[in-house]
């Protein structure tokens, strides 16, 4: 099964993915976390942040997630770029696919802007920022949509996710 968590930078994707993984870990040794930033650091040498390069990055994560899920691992993905064609591919090809969309206001995102992406994009210091010069594609039909502005506790959201996904409910510590 693949749980795909998406949202803009700063929406809480990695935080939620880590919380979910940590809740499952004590009773589920076959849960794997794939974070987009970690995958890029490990396998993305020479890959930039333009829209075509972001597609390549997501396709790498998709392929990796499929290989792991085909071996009956529970794969938790935290990945930013959510182009509709890529999400459609996920739904058609990833076993047990469950999509989570973290919807966050720009005020929240800019408040959490650890990478200074949004401030640099506003000032013109950088380009290729999703939500500024690269369009953000809001997922059409996520299995779970979370208002990141309203729900601050990732453990609470991770527990809700476990309750919703029948495959996960037996693994809660």
Across the structure, where does each feature detected by a protein language model lie?
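Walker A (P-loop) ATP-phosphate-binding motif of ABC ATPase nucleotide-binding domains
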Residues: 2
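Hydrophobic anchor at the beta1->P-loop junction of P-loop NTPases
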Residues: 5
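P-loop (Walker A) phosphate-binding loop of NTP-binding proteins
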Residues: 8
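ATP-binding Walker
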Residues: 11
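Walker A/P-loop
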Residues: 14
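Conserved substrate/cofactor phosphate-moiety recognition/catalytic segment
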Residues: 17-63
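Glycine-rich phosphate-binding loop used to anchor ATP phosphates in small-molecule kinases
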Residues: 42, 50-98, 102, 118-121, ...
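Small-molecule kinase domains that catalyze NTP-dependent phosphoryl transfer to phosphate-bearing small molecules
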Residues: 111-159, 165-173
């Amino acid at each position: 099964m693949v749980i795909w968590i998406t949202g803009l930078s700063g929406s809480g994707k990695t935080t939620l993915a880590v919380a979910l993984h940590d809740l499952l870990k004590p009773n589920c040794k076959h849960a794997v976390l794939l974070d987009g930033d970690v995958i890029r650091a490990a396998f993305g040498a020479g890959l930039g942040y333009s829209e075509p390069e972001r597609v390549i990055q997501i396709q790498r994560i998709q392929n990796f997630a499929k290989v792991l899920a085909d071996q009956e691992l529970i794969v938790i993905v935290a990945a930013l770029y959510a182009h509709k064609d890529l999400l459609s591919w996920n739904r058609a090809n990833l076993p047990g696919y469950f999509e989570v969309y973290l919807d966050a206001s720009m005020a929240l995102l800019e408040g959490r802007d650890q990478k200074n992406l949004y401030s640099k994009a506003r000032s013109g210091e950088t380009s290729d920022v999703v939500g500024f010069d690269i369009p953000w594609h809001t997922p059409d039909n996520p299995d779970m949509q979370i208002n990141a502005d309203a729900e601050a506790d990732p453990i609470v959201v991770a527990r809700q996710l476990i309750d919703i996904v029948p495959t996960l409910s037996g693994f809660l510590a």
